[in-house]
């Protein structure tokens, strides 16, 4: 187990704590430094005092302001260990604006192409829309760091080649904290890319594709430089994009684009120009001249000069609170501090297990926490239940907020990283964003039990080991010592304390009715009702459920135990008819109305579970259709006509075996971990009501429940037989379903629960017909 070694001395830590006393005053633990770090109290005080002491006005008016801005410009270069001889500093609104500036002004030439890494911030993806020049390619991280060429010389100057290709990647992944080795910068500048990546778009002919162009590197350093040193003498990307609030917490609204001398040679001013970027522009003629100074050509309009001046106190505060030592610089010390906290947290999380041995969390990282040059101060994970199913990150956000812990959940504007770490293929992404309707920034956290994002914890220089321990204690107390319903009740009781977005998430914590399945013909396939559909209830169960059955020539009910092909008969309930389908071309219909059917129909008697049932024969035509398709002579279709009561409590029943409804928890099905699609496994259990809860098999503890306000009594668990071994899509048998349930239930064959509707307490002569709707909230008593 990792022991934590503090980077800061006791006196240094005491001074830092004093600067952030507002955290203790607000009983807050702040763990989203990858979103923004926090500003020190003396930092904003000093910035305000500077504004009070000086007359700082438009830099076009006041030389003092210009001097301040130049001072900041030189301080930025010093911070990254470079000089104005090697890099220009262009002020922007933020890192996103810097990326946009590169996309707008980079000269691709006639054959240059744009390459970007899959695990990039959304802003890098946005560059694609500005660079539709020749070709756009997506690289996976291993195609950048794994496809290196041996460096064989110095970085060449701009050559006579016809194209310039641009590769953009993040120095540190803001999802996981993984750092791409920066040695690849020089190697790619010299030798180009070994592989171009996946082609997304191209206007080039085959002969011009992937030509040996000159390669330039745009480094998205926003996440990296917040807690890590970037030495631009050692690594020389052509463009560096960053936001200062990530480093200092204050001010916001100012970032920078650093452009190397090499990068400047292929940086062409776009058509637009603003105030301050030109020597002159005639209104009467299409004539203008750009400024000679490189950075002035690209800083359109008045700079955010007050914010820029405020950066000086950011640099001073950082250097004062985390002073350089003989061995390490300020940023190296911060990097060591946040990495140590991340390593400690990751190790502690790995130690957390449920009583049955299941790990509490699923961690997402590439190289572990052994080397701070490859991993930053970020830990990404999802929480799992005792059965192995995932807890939605929205619930974690709610629980954390109620414990005063501020962290981040979702995909963090990095869908590519989400896709990689969660193992989502392209179809899964479509299922999340196009079919299920998730959008960036929402709390739509689980689809079919699989996470759509993660929980991210990230550290800054003011984060303490006590902060990390409070997070660990929250996870232990909430997810190792309590049950899902207890957590939900806790969140609901405290919901008014949550911010608005999380209040909306509280409404999603309760399980909901996902699907209803009506089986009009006993032992045949289901007619399914899904979101947002509703269905009426009768005093026997779901309307039309198990109202028909097929009998053999001896009048005995035919089930899948004798004829698995029954599952291939698919019913469709229409306005006035029940249509039966077998295969693609064979269909037949019978009337839904008993009045239409009863006129010329013979009455018959059969048995269900040893109980006699009365039925109406549906005629020769459908009988012949059944016999031909199932390959059995003498089959008849009967419809229940008389009342049938259970032997136990006289509840009214259709042709079901035991109770009015069979409820299934999709989370329990998921725990079986079969290789077949989840919906196919759900179909095996032939349930009427399908819900999805926070943990598997919790339905076995229910005594009563309500769905959309309709009350149900739990009759008990469903004891399973080998019927569940039949694949309801194909009719094929496979024994592993039964053996897996037996193993999970320690020899018992229970899966799903029987429930019965509690009659309405009403004195109306004709009570209103009740409906259930997919999406109805399930409340457990």
From Swiss-Prot:
InterPro entries, sorted: Aminotrans_V_dom, MoCF_Sase_C, MoCo_sulfurase, MOCOS_middle, PyrdxlP-dep_Trfase, PyrdxlP-dep_Trfase_major, PyrdxlP-dep_Trfase_small, Pyrv_Knase-like_insert_dom_sf
Keywords: Molybdenum cofactor biosynthesis, Phosphoprotein, Pyridoxal phosphate, Transferase
EC number(s) given by UniProt: 2.8.1.9
Needed cofactors: pyridoxal 5'-phosphate
N6-(pyridoxal phosphate)lysine found at: 246
Catalytic reactions on record: Mo-molybdopterin + L-cysteine + AH2 = thio-Mo-molybdopterin + L-alanine + A + H2O
Catalytic machinery residues: 413
Every MOSC domain range: 635-781
Residues where Phosphoserine is found: 734
GO biological process: Mo-molybdopterin cofactor biosynthetic process; molybdopterin cofactor biosynthetic process; molybdopterin cofactor metabolic process
Molecular function, one GO term: pyridoxal phosphate binding
Pathway in which this enzyme or protein is active: Cofactor biosynthesis; molybdopterin biosynthesis
General function of this protein: Sulfurates the molybdenum cofactor. Sulfation of molybdenum is essential for xanthine dehydrogenase (XDH) and aldehyde oxidase (ADO) enzymes in which molybdenum cofactor is liganded by 1 oxygen and 1 sulfur atom in active form.
Entry similarity comment: Belongs to the class-V pyridoxal-phosphate-dependent aminotransferase family. MOCOS subfamily.
HAMAP family xrefs: MOCOS (MF_03050)
Protein name, entry field: Molybdenum cofactor sulfurase
Source species taxonomy: Eukaryota, Metazoa, Ecdysozoa, Arthropoda, Hexapoda
Gene: mal
């Amino acid at each position: 187990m990792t022991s934590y070694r503090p980077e800061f001395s006791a006196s240094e830590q005491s001074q830092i704590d004093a600067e952030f006393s507002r955290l203790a005053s607000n009983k807050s633990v702040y763990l989203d430094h990858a979103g923004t770090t926090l500003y020190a109290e003396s930092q904003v005080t000093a910035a305000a005092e500077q504004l009070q002491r000086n007359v700082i006005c438009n830099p076009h008016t006041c030389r003092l302001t210009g001097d301040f801005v130049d001072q900041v410009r030189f301080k930025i270069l010093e911070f990254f260990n470079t000089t104005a001889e090697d890099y220009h500093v262009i002020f922007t609104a933020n890192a996103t604006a810097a990326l946009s500036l590169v996309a707008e002004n980079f000269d691709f030439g006639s054959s240059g192409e744009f390459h970007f890494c899959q695990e990039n911030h959304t802003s890098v993806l946005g560059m694609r829309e500005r660079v539709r020049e020749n070709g756009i390619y997506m690289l996976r991280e291993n195609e950048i760091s794994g496809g290196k060429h041996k460096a064989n010389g110095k970085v060449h100057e701009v050559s006579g080649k016809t194209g310039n290709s641009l590769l953009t990647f993040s120095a540190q992944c803001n999802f996981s904290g993984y750092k791409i080795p920066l040695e690849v910068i020089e190697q790619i500048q010299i030798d180009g890319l070994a592989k171009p990546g996946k082609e997304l778009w191209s206007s080039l002919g085959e002969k011009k594709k992937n030509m040996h162009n000159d390669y330039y590197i745009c480094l998205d350093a926003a996440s990296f430089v917040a807690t890590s040193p970037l030495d631009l003498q050692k690594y020389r990307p052509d463009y560096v994009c960053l936001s200062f609030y990530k480093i200092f917490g204050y001010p916001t609204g100012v970032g920078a684009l650093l452009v190397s001398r090499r990068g400047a040679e292929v940086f062409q001013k776009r058509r637009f120009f603003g105030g301050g970027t030109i020597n002159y522009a005639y209104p009467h003629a299409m004539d203008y001249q750009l400024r000679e100074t490189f950075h002035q050509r690209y800083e359109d309009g008045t700079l955010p000069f007050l914010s820029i001046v405020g950066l000086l106190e950011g640099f001073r505060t950082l250097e004062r609170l985390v002073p350089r030592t003989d061995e390490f610089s300020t940023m190296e010390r911060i990097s060591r501090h946040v990495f140590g906290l991340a390593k400690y947290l990751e190790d502690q999380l790995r130690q957390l297990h449920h009583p049955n041995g299941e790990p509490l969390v699923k961690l997402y990282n590439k190289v572990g926490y052994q080397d701070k040059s490859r991993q930053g101060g970020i830990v990404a994970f999802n929480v799992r239940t005792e059965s192995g199913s995932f807890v939605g990150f929205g619930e974690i956000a709610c629980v954390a907020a109620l414990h005063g812990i501020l962290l981040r959940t979702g995909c963090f504007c990095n869908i590519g990283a989400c896709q990689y770490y969660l193992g989502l293929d392209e179809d899964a992404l479509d299922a999340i964003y196009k079919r299920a309707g998730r959008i960036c920034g929402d709390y739509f956290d689980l689809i079919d039990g699989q996470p759509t994002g993660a929980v991210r914890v990230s550290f800054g220089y003011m984060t303490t080991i006590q902060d990390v321990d409070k997070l660990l204690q929250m996870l232990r107390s909430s997810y190792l010592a309590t049950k899902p319903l207890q957590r939900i009740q806790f969140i609901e009781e405290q919901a008014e304390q949550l911010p608005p977005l999380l209040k909306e998430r509280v409404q999603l914590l309760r399980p909901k009715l996902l699907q209803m399945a009506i089986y009009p013909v006993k032992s045949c396939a289901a007619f399914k009702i899904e979101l947002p559909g509703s269905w009426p209830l009768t005093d026997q169960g779901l309307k039309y459920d198990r109202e028909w059955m097929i009998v053999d020539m001896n009048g005995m009910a035919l089930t899948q135990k004798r004829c698995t092909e029954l599952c291939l008969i698919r019913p469709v309930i229409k306005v006035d008819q029940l249509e039966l389908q077998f295969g693609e071309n064979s269909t037949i219909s019978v009337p839904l109305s008993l009045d239409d059917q009863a006129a010329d129909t013979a009455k018959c008697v059969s048995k269900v579970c040893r109980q006699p049932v009365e039925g109406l024969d549906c005629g020769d035509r459908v009988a012949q259709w059944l016999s031909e398709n199932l390959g059995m002579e003498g089959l008849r279709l009967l419809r229940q006509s008389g009342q049938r009561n259970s032997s136990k409590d006289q509840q009214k029943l259709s042709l079901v075996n035991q109770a009015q409804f069979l409820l299934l928890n999709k989370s329990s099905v998921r725990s079986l971990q079969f290789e077949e699609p989840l919906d196919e496994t759900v179909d095996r259990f032939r349930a009427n009501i399908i819900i999805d809860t926070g943990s598997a098999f919790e339905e076995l503890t229910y005594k009563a429940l309500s769905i959309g306000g309709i009350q149900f009594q739990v009759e008990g668990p469903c004891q399973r037989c080998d019927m569940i071994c039949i694949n309801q899509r194909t009719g094929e048998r496979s024994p592993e379903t039964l053996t897996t349930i037996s193993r999970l239930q320690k020899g018992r064959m229970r899966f799903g629960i029987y429930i019965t509707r509690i009659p309405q307490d009403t004195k109306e002569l004709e009570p209103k017909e009740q409906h259930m709707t997919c999406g109805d909230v399930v409340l457990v008593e």
